[in-house]
Amino acid sequence: MSTSCSPKVEIIPAELAYQAEATTGEGSIWHPERHTLFWVDIEGQTLYEYHPDTKECSSWKFDRMVSTVVPETDSTVIIALQNEIVRVNLHDGHTTSVAPIPDENGKVRCNDGKCDPAGHLWVGTMGFGAPKGAGTLYTVSPAGTVTTKLKKVTISNGIVWSSNKKF
C-alpha cells in the first residue's frame, strides 16, 4: 500500500529564457493578446516584456519602484508605481495617471496587485522594511476610483481568484 497521496509529477528540465539580473523580480503575467510575458523589477524600477517567439526582451525604466503589471489592451498595460497606478503605452512608453495611491507620507509603497473578474485592480501597499500592519489593500475601478478594502495589512502578495471567481 502506498503512503503517498500525491499524484505523480513529471520533472522537466528548466531553461533560462532571459537573463534579467533583476534586483527584485516579481509579478510575472502572460499577456494573452500580445503572446508575451511581463514582469517587474521592483527595486530596479523596470517593467519587462519577453517575446518568446523572438527571444527578445523589451524594458521600460521608471523614476519610482514598479511593483505589479496587468494587461489592459494589445498596446497598454496597467502598472503600480510606488504611489500611483498608471497606464503604459507599450508603443512609446508614455504613461498616463489612472489613480494616486495614498503613500502615508512616503512610508509605504505599492506591492502586489491583480485585476478581479469585474475589472477592478486590487493592489496592496506595504511599509518600507515590511513593518507589521503598515499597509492597506485597495481596489481601483476602471474609472480610477480608489476604495480602501482592508487596513493594517503587512504585505499583500499573491493576489488571485479561484475558478469560481472568489477572492
Residues covered by each model-derived region:
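A short loop-to-beta-strand structural motif that recurs across blades of beta-propeller domains
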Residues: T46-Y48, E84-V86, G135-Y138
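Glycine/small-residue-rich loop that forms an oxyanion/phosphate-binding "nest" at active or ligand-binding sites
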Residues: V77-D116, G127, P131
